[in-house]
């Protein structure tokens, strides 16, 4: 539940899921007869600071960066920011420093236009030109298609493509910064975001929380 921050680990068939509430991993290829370790990070705006507190404890217990221990890291909204940074190899303390630097600037902006502009600026400052081929483990960034009210999930591995292996492009060819901006754009507090895919399609997106504030089920589907 929003406001309650806890780490739980459960078995789900062949998957092992660690879900951090108020806040989701898959190597590029992994044997299907092995368990897939999933880290699921849900949305909650500035509550991402609580999520980072829980993740710091998990990282300390594991004694290694989280991307090395999770095969799939899925995130929605503020959880998408954390998921992307972890999957790129950042340690939790590094993510926390970035949060302290950028999140207050976004949240303190008054209008939708100002919030959207600051979110875009921060996303591009942090992620620059990084693409989904640059991550170190499996990732899923959840956004929502505005017109269809259905999820659009940015992934990095063909293992997550289900029946679309032939046409799969990591992240649909969209930069990580743009995917993060889309996943965090909670309309009407933020403006809708239009992304352009590698196939030339322009898709209008909003916050992933409108379809799955907790992306665990999507992650499990990709792991099976």
Which positions does each model-derived feature cover?
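Cytosolic, low-complexity regulatory segments enriched in Ser/Pro/Gly with interspersed Lys/Arg
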Residues: 1-32
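An acidic intrinsically disordered interaction segment
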Residues: 11-22, 45-52, 172-189
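Patatin-like phospholipase
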Residues: 18, 32-40, 46-127, 166, ...
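Surface-exposed acidic, glycine-flexible loop patches that form ligand/cofactor-binding
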Residues: 24-31, 62-67, 124-139, 194
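Short hydrophobic segments within beta-strands
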Residues: 41-42, 142
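Glycine-rich Rossmann-fold phosphate-binding loop(s) that bind the pyrophosphate
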Residues: 43-44, 208
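Active-site gating loop/helix substructures
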Residues: 134-224
